[in-house]
Amino acid sequence: NSPGAIITLLVNKIDYQLSQIAQIIESNDAKILSLYSENLESNNQIKLTIKISDSKLGAVLQTFSRYDYTVQDVFSDDEISNQGKQRYDHLMKYLNV
């Protein structure tokens, strides 16, 4: 039960390159903690469930988007919820001015 974020990707079988996915994650100073792949026969895709260190989740997600990967789900307690809280706090400060 190590801390981290879980990302679920959908990748076409013909486009699947684990080395590129690992490079995207590691180039954003995150580490792959575990990976599970599932073959989806119905739509010729592979579903990847990747647990990464939570250090730079936002940067990893932006890079996946830039490389046209389909991010199906993201599960994290820290960065995304903290970002939402920070935006809420900024809004409250603005409204108090």
PLM regions: where:
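A conserved regulatory-domain signal marking ACT and ACT-like small-molecule sensing domains
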Residues: 1-97
